[in-house]
A protein has these predicted regions:
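Conserved donor-binding/catalytic core segment of Leloir-type glycosyltransferases
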Residues: 82-108, 120-122, 243
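Conserved acidic donor-binding segment of nucleotide-sugar-dependent glycosyltransferases
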Residues: 210-222, 231-237
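Nucleotide-activated donor-binding/catalytic signature segment of Leloir-type glycosyltransferases, i.e.
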Residues: 124, 132-160
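Acidic anion/phosphate-binding donor-loop and adjacent secondary structure
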Residues: 63, 67-68, 72-87, 100
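Acidic donor-binding loop of glycosyltransferase active sites
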Residues: 162-179, 194
Length: 270
């Protein structure tokens, strides 16, 4: 690499926190990985002219020469207004225990007591270490007819399933990497007018205070989650308002267009 070159580096993850959350790494391996990344990060500052950060929280470890550019979705027409709802609940994203896989199963089991035919669409990759346990848990709890595992799908096809769903889920566990980062799935739900139920982290609550497109709840409170979902099913006026608010907020602010302009300006001025 020529030192005279100007390099802009894009950071989309808090890598150290991500390493700490890897359950398949033993403590020694985590320590080696973290120290290695820390050294690499320090050395990178000798070569990188500017950093693009996907979250405000990343400013804590990249304080200078950085610009926050949020990973908002590109607005597309998914014809969501004319789609028949086939799924009561939907989740899009990697399916792991920390991202709420077992929480969603427990919630569905509770909901099934009052809504026997309730169904959940799970869209995303399931790591091999969890896949067998997840399938066994679904079968053991008699939820084979209530949960559909779509696996990994391209973005457009995944959004077609989201369009066919009533309520989006984002019940991430209170891990530091999640608490301080916006999950893009919230904006995916908003784009097609799907109200969502999410974890009650301060960052998420701040978003809800601005756009009023969903509801937040303690992700470890299964009864509370279930009651919140049933409340949305039963209150069509509230449901419709949340749906409209999400679409309006996404179109006005939480889309890629404004971020794209920031990115172009940054690169042109670098």
């Amino acid at each position: 690499m020529c030192i005279r070159d100007r390099v802009v580096y894009d950071i989309h993850e808090n890598t150290i926190q991500s390493i700490l959350q890897k359950k398949w790494l033993n403590p020694f391996a985590k320590l080696i990985a973290i120290v290695g990344y820390f050294i690499l990060e320090k050395l990178s500052k000798l070569f990188f002219h500017h950093y693009i950060l996907a979250e405000d929280s990343y400013k804590s470890f990249i304080k200078n020469n950085s610009t926050v550019i949020y990973n908002y979705p590109i607005i597309k027409d998914y014809n969501h207004q004319n789609v028949k709802k086939e799924y009561d609940l939907v989740y899009i994203g990697d399916i792991t225990e920390d991202r709420g896989a077992l929480i969603m199963i427990k919630t569905l089991l509770t909901l099934k007591k009052s809504i026997p035919k309730i169904n959940l669409a799970l869209i995303g990759n399931v790591p091999p270490i969890l896949e067998d346990a997840l399938i066994r848990s679904i079968s053991r709890n008699g939820l084979d007819n209530n949960i559909r595992l779509f696996g990994y799908m391209n973005y457009y096809d995944a959004m077609q399933i989201v369009c066919k769903s009533k309520i989006g889920l984002c019940l991430l566990k209170p891990k530091k990497n999640y608490i301080e980062s916006y999950p893009t799935k919230l904006f995916d739900y908003m784009q097609v007018g799907v109200p969502f139920v999410c974890s009650n982290f301060p960052l998420y609550d701040n978003l809800l205070n601005k756009c009023n497109a969903g509801l937040s709840i303690d992700p470890l409170n299964i009864k509370g989650i279930s009651s919140t979902i049933i409340g949305l099913f039963d209150d069509s006026e509230k449901y419709n308002n949340l749906s409209k608010n999400g679409i309006n907020a996404l179109n006005k602010e939480y889309n890629w267009l404004a971020q794209e302009n920031k990115l172009f300006h940054l690169i042109q001025s670098s």
